A protein has these predicted regions:
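A Zn2+-metalloprotease active-site environment signal
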Residues: 7-9, 22-271
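Bacterial N-terminal signal peptides that target proteins for export
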Residues: 1-11
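Bacterial N-terminal signal peptides
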Residues: 10-19
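Intrinsically disordered, low-complexity segments
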Residues: 2, 19-21
Length: 271
């Protein structure tokens, strides 16, 4: 009896799952692991976003200057993204995006973007951003993670490991709590779960680069990214690392890559 046959069969099945689960990202054109349709992720996003806002203090832009600033910067980043996709004859890639920016009163140093353009900024990160330019860096970076479908890839990996790669609807009906937790972790909603998963260095570099492009196109200064990450790192010295750093690891090499990409990002000024 050949004891290796079951192992070979299992290996081939895993390979088939990966091949069938690969799709092309509409922004980069690169293949990625994603067996969850974007429309399903957006549908879940809208539900989770509403639930999150119901359980947190959302600051009104009519009454709070910082909330108004988040809305203002967010609107400019959104217009920049829409121009970029229009100039690339790729506006269809934004189908289902219903942009929404909210500031919540929470000391957590964090910000995130769910599929479909659902963004939350925590007041705890504002002492580190300090200005509109740095806030644009943060928003551009977070929106890029969503447009690049990094969270979808992470959730696909988690579902493959934990529920065998079944359809999202099946996972929600059979293991609703676990599936919702996977979704929240995949998008760095740290206050809703006990831990979050760090983005890979590859994902971070992609989000940094596209985020800088949106920042420039929106009329902000991209060089503020270097000062922002310096302040972020200083804020963690001697203390528990901010939630933002747990999902967005930073180091000297990263800042070097950001600095090296700035000339390329500046080519998008005025576009």
């Amino acid at each position: 009896m050949n004891n290796s046959r079951p192992i070979v069969v299992a290996f081939l099945l895993v390979v088939m799952v990966f091949i069938l689960s690969c799709s092309k990202n509409t922004l980069t054109g690169k293949s990625q692991l994603s067996f969850i349709p974007e429309k399903d992720m957006q549908s879940m996003s809208y539900t989770q976003y509403k639930d999150f806002l119901k359980t947190h203090e959302v600051l009104s832009p009519q009454k709070d200057a910082n909330a108004a600033m988040v809305q203002k910067v967010g609107a400019r980043i959104t217009k920049a993204i829409e121009r970029y996709f229009k100039n690339s004859n790729n506006s269809a890639a934004l189908t289902g995006y219903n942009w929404e920016y909210n500031l919540v009163n929470d000391k957590l140093v964090n910000a995130w973007c769910m599929p479909g353009g659902k963004i939350v900024v925590y007041t705890g990160i504002l002492p580190i951003t300090q200005n509109e330019n740095a806030l644009a860096i943060v928003l551009g970076h977070e929106v890029s993670h969503a447009l690049l479908q990094h969270g979808t890839q992470r959730m696909s990996q988690s579902m493959l490991q934990q529920v065998g790669g079944v359809a999202l609807s099946v996972a929600l009906s059979t293991k609703p709590a676990e599936t919702q937790d996977m979704f929240l972790r995949a998008y760095g909603v740290g206050s809703a779960v006990g831990f979050t998963l760090p983005f890979s260095r590859k994902h971070e570099l992609e989000a940094d680069q596209y985020g800088l492009i949106w920042t420039v196109m929106a009329g902000y200064d991209p060089t503020e990214a270097l000062a922002f990450w310096d302040r972020m790192e200083k804020s963690s010295k001697g203390n528990t690392p901010p939630e933002f750093l747990s999902t967005h690891p930073s180091d000297v090499k990263r800042k070097e890559k950001i600095k090296a990409f700035l000339p390329e990002a500046m080519k998008y000024k005025g576009k």
